[in-house]
Amino acid sequence: FLIFLGGILVMFIYVSSLSANEKFAVDLTSFMWVVPTIVLSFLVLNKNFMFMSPSS
């Protein structure tokens, strides 16, 4: 999961450096879609990981 977030960060920096002369603004609607998606995916991955781990 951390590798995925690192890749997203690298792509964001790369795209923002390509369009350095233009204003790069994140609108609120896309932000409102991205944050819950990341949180839900983290919860789903965490729940699957808890079910796969052996209980002792």
From Swiss-Prot:
This is NADH-ubiquinone oxidoreductase chain 6. Core subunit of the mitochondrial membrane respiratory chain NADH dehydrogenase (Complex I) that is believed to belong to the minimal assembly required for catalysis. Complex I functions in the transfer of electrons from NADH to the respiratory chain. The immediate electron acceptor for the enzyme is believed to be ubiquinone. Its EC number is 7.1.1.2. One of its GO terms (cellular component) is mitochondrial membrane. Belongs to the complex I subunit 6 family. Keywords: Electron transport, Membrane, Mitochondrion, NAD, Respiratory chain, Translocase, Transmembrane, Transmembrane helix, Transport, Ubiquinone. The chain crosses the membrane at residues 1-21, 24-44. Its main location: mitochondrion. One of its GO terms (molecular function) is NADH dehydrogenase (ubiquinone) activity. It is a multi-pass membrane protein. It catalyses: a ubiquinone + NADH + 5 H(+)(in) = a ubiquinol + NAD(+) + 4 H(+)(out). The lineage of its organism: Eukaryota, Metazoa, Ecdysozoa, Arthropoda, Crustacea. It comes from the Eukaryota. It comes from Artemia salina. It is found in: Mitochondrion membrane.
